[in-house]
Amino acid sequence: SGSGKSTLLRYILGLEKTKTGLIKLLDKEVSKLNKKDLYKLRKRIGVAFQNGALFSSMTVRENIELPLHENTELDEKTIHIMSRLKLELMQLSGTESLMPSELSGGMLKRAGLARAIIMEPELLFFDEPSAGLDPITSAHLDNLILQLRDALNMSIIIVTHDIESAFKIADRI
């Protein structure tokens, strides 16, 4: 705690500018990108935030579909199908019309994860995925992360203080 893990993630994502050093992400030097190019780069990655980062005034489905509405020209039917599939993948079928306040902690994280993967990113970042979860829910989330990695064949970077989860999920630490 307090060792700079989340700060490092903010630097990698270009949310904060580095004072020294070099960060390359998907063959792009993050600190040298202008706003337009940084926006393009961020469309190629997904981020699952510690608290799910869902908008409280939107339903689960609206939250998950938001990146598609903002970044694609897909029709509404296709967007609904994609969000339904991601919800099924996250074991959240039937939660589409719920508000974030109606979800448990584990459900919030899975809904945030569904939104993080809706654009089918090349790279997925997790910020403290097990924070605030009981050991059983944390273990289920670890298994879900492994299933996603294998099913979607994507690279995943996890910021965590949970040593057990790190060793279970990681290929490299």
Q: Where are the regions a protein language model picked out?
A:
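Helix-to-loop junction immediately C-terminal to a conserved catalytic motif
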Residues: 13
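Conserved ABC ATPase "signature" region
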Residues: 29, 76-94
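Conserved ABC ATPase signature
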Residues: 99-103, 107
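A short, proline-enriched helix->beta-strand linker immediately N-terminal to the Walker B motif
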Residues: 118-122
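Catalytic Walker B motif of ABC-type/P-loop ATPase nucleotide-binding domains
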Residues: 124-127
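Helix N-cap at the start of a conserved alpha-helix in ABC-type nucleotide-binding domains
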Residues: 135-137
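Helical segment within the ABC ATPase nucleotide-binding domain
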Residues: 139-152
